[in-house]
Amino acid sequence: GGIFYKTISVFIPNECSPRFDIASKEGTPWTGFKNMEMTSDKPNEVNFEFIRQLKKDFPNKVIVSSIMGASDDEWAILAKESEKAGADMIECNFSCPQMTSSTMGSDVGQNPDLVKHYCEVASSSTKLPIIAKMTPNLGNMEIPARAAIEGGAKGIAAINTVKSITNLDINLRTGMPVVNGKSAISGYSGAAVKPIALRFISDLMHDPIVSKVPITGMGGIETWRDCLEFLMLGASNLQVTTAVMQYGYRIVEDMISGISHYMNDYGINKLQDIVGTAVGNIVGADDLDRSYKILVQIDKEKCVGCGRCYVSCFDAAHQAIEYDYATRVPTINEDKCVGCHLCLNVCPVMHCIQPGKLVYKDKKDNHAVTLKESNSYL
């Protein structure tokens, strides 16, 4: 393992206070985290001395210097200083969404020409390999990722934070966090962005050019299962930040332990044997098998009679659940059920509603179907 040092720039930010906000549900730990922080607020001589000391103290760990310039000269200087400090690798950050200059951060990351150019500048200024950190604030990440590779990047990192407004103060009528009555659009991270991150990792791995270079995955990683999902979609190494801010470095030990147990249970000897194993199973919507439906079954012993499945199906699906108000027991109407599994996902009782009978739309059909497994990991 190793560390990615907080992004270093020639520009030293004057940070606002407060600068964090969260999105949560019903008092649970936050699922989303908004930050209005920019690059490192320390002088560069301090930053590079930290990198130098880290490499001295942990010579067998990978130390990555993350840099962000606003001009050719700045990218070149930061790359050279990173190498002098003893970093093993350089990450070019083209993706921070809350920079105060349009010449830095995600504004650059949305411009493939600038991404390519700055990668050329950085890579020509150092012998160290560079990777380009992509912004998710666009439609097709493959375009700037290809540009980065053309510019000399040896790998891609994805994703950085998503532009957001998490909450509003409805009394002051402004966003949060509130800074003297105002707020700003800024980066969103945490578990809530994992689906977005996984989608971009999949997109990159389906690109014939980008998939040939290593991908560093990040965005919503909290557990060992999250780690596995990124690895299976093609990320060969991972970054974790927001979860460490929430739970501390100890969660990394849990991640390593969980992955190790999974590998032992499945007889997997090398972590690399996991990487990319799910890529081929992510296909276009038109390639999905639509010849059958999977009905659901309700365990009447586990059912608590809350009626949530009935309400959701009646108001937002196909009215395929009948509810006995006297006994508070729901029943599936198999003729109406389309197998959408909305009820399964709203049920608050674990394993109360589960996949049931497979029904082919053409009654003469009986081809083999791969179904979701139910085991201790799911």
Please annotate each region the language model reported.
Residues 1-63, 68-73, 255:
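N-terminal capping/small domains of soluble enzymes
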Residues 334-353, 371-378:
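Short Fe-S-cluster ligation motifs
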Residues 308-326, 342-360:
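Iron-sulfur cluster-binding cysteine motifs and their immediate structural context
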Residues 13-29, 165-185, 231, 243-268, ...:
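C-terminal helical cap(s) of enzyme catalytic domains, especially alpha/beta-barrels
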Residues 194, 199, 257-306, 311, ...:
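Extended, intrinsically disordered, low-complexity segments
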Residues 2, 68-216, 222-237, 284, ...:
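Alpha/beta enzyme core
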Residues 324-335:
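Short linker/helix segments within small regulatory modules
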Residues 6-8, 94, 160, 242-243:
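Short secondary-structure boundary segments
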